[in-house]
Amino acid sequence: MEIRVREYDKKDFDGVNIMLYEAFRRLKKIDISDNPNFHEVVAECNGRVVGYLLLTKVLNPIRNRHYYIIDYVCVVRDYRGYGVGEKMMNYAEEYARHCGGMYLQLTCRWTRIEAHKLYEKCGFVKRESDIFRKELIWY
C-alpha cells in the first residue's frame, strides 16, 4: 500500500468533507485554500484521499515568531494502522520547519489513547497543563 502525502487541492473538498463528518460527526469544511495562515495536508492511496490534517500558523507576539497548531487529524477507518497519520505528521513537521516555525502544538482528548500513541511516536510530549475553553457559539 503506497501512501502519498501532499498539499490539499480544491478537488479534494468533497472527500475531505466526508472524512471530517465521519471522524467528528458535525463538522463541515469551508474553503480556506486562499488564506495564507492555513496549510491543509491530505494523504492519498490509489487516488483516494484517506487522511487529512490542518496546520494553522499563529504569531507569538512576545517572541515575534510564529508556530503552528495541528488540527483535525483524521484517517479513514480502513486505513488506520498503516502509517498514514505518521506520514502526515512528518509532512507537517517538515513544512513547519521549512517555514521557520518555532514549534508544533496540538490538543487531543484524553480518551483518544491511540491518537496519543501516534503523537508521542512522532516526538510530541504531553504537557502538564489543562486547557480551558468557553464556547461562544453552539453548533
Predicted regions and their residues:
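Active-site rim helix/loop that mediates acceptor-substrate recognition in acyltransferases
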Residues: F24-E40
